[in-house]
Amino acid sequence: MIKNCIRLTVSAILSALISACATSPEQSLYDEIGGHKTLNTIYGVAITRIYTDPVIGHYFKGVPKKHLRDQLVLQTCELIGGPCEYDGKSMVESHKDLNIKEREFYILVEYVQGAMRDVGLTYQQENRILKKLAPIKYETVYL
């Protein structure tokens, strides 16, 4: 009886140790921020501001807001670990011949950042998203 009790105790301890060592899959940034709904809100807010901006608004004339929002959501979703697959034009193709200046690019970034704050993202989440989006600058500025 004592042997069985010892075996059960050892077995329980080993089971607990093995369970503690098992790693659960890390939550994606996409899921952490609230997924598609949050991205849709962020870009909806940012686009409203961008389209009326006196410096960069002219770049978006003729581009339907919903189309732009959908493309930005898809692209960001894919970059931050969501289930989406961006299938739009390449950034180089979409921005060629626009002569976007670095200053203009950062105006857009500020609107997106502001929208992230407005929906309640933490600075850490905001910075992690911006880090994923940062390479886009080199595909859009001065092309």
Give the residues covered by each predicted segment.
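Bacterial N-terminal signal peptides that target proteins for export
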Residues: M1-V10
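Globin-like tetrapyrrole-binding proteins
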Residues: A22-L143
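C-terminal motif of bacterial Sec signal peptides marking the signal peptidase cleavage site
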Residues: L17-A20
